[in-house]
């Protein structure tokens, strides 16, 4: 089994050290209460180096019992949404590029996955049209998410066609992964359309994702 590890650049104790303001997390107690840029990028670098060292599988300082290294690193998640990152676009770009450089220096064969774009609504497109040119040299795989909204509506290609067009508009030619795929009905038709529009890999989130809940029977 291959692991795609998501890196979060914030920890409660670290954010408290420079009196960052609390933020509202979508996951309650299961998530940090602070979502801002690290107080110290030097300390954050130390964390990243130790994290990669523990899971890179090089035989030195590895996690006890590690049988398969982590190669795929997803840096942050949906930064255009304040529920996951309380910072400016410039803060995100700084953290992302910094993280990518540190990881690649420590683990040259690492594959960096772009922080997943939450959707392709106008506000998402505006954010990523600005951010992508600033980070495009620091990731290997482009990443889009599709979670149905409270009304249960879905995009028939799971946003992949709009995302591919956005990437082309900013001269980004990278594989596309759909790492959070939630469908509104039988998933096969949606997956086929996503693949035909350029998705290389789809990770299905099943029936337990955020958004309008869907029964297992409804997916058949």
Regions found by a protein language model. Name each.
Residues 178-220:
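Aromatic/acidic polysaccharide-binding cleft in carbohydrate-active enzymes
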Residues 115, 145, 176-182:
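Acidic/histidine-rich, metal-coordinating catalytic segments
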Residues 2, 111, 140, 175-176, ...:
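Beta-sheet entry/capping signal
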